[in-house]
Amino acid sequence: MTKKWSIVATALAGVVMCGALVYYNFIDKKKVVEGVAVGDTCPDFTVDTIAANDGVFGFDGNEYNLYANNGKVRVINFWATWCGGCKEEMPHFNEFAKAYPEVEVIAICGESGPKDVVAEWMNTDALHVQASGWANFSLQFGFYGPDDENVYYSLGGTSMLPMTVVVDEDGVIRYNKEKNLDFEGLQQIVLPLLND
């Protein structure tokens, strides 16, 4: 009987220790935010932009600021190089950006490493074979790194990618979800905002 209780106590202590490790190491109190909801004013943010020069991606020293382009509907997509679903939906976002140039579409990549890694990846990734090259994409690309993660979290991100936020002309969030979207899904969300 004592051996049985000893095993139970050890297992319980292990569960408590694992919970404490997860809590103190993986749940950063600065990152746990209330998040924004549909109908809220979108918080302003600025990210570095990634651009192609002669077909080669790099950081061009420019920035994207959400409210610099107030008066337009904006589609903000958060993705990462390791996210398979993100890469699957990227051609849909590109197709949407080409079809609706009056809508501003930006794909913001978040990585834990240096930003140059993203540009290198975009220059060599296999997706360029499917999409005729990242450089031919019509949407804008941005980057947020370890020091800028508040951009993702301040817009309601938790831990899942891809995430898309749609902001209307007045800066009000009209869509905010962590899920994949295709061209038709983007149309269903954005087109009613263009007809307001």
Question: What residues fall within each predicted segment?
Answer:
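Short pre-active-site segment immediately N-terminal to redox-active cysteine/selenocysteine motifs
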Residues: 72-74, 78-82, 160
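Residue-level recognition of beta-strand->loop/alpha-helix junctions
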Residues: 107-111, 143, 177
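Conserved redox-active cysteine motifs that mediate thiol-disulfide chemistry
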Residues: 78-95
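Thiol-/selenol-based redox modules, centered on thioredoxin-like
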Residues: 159-196
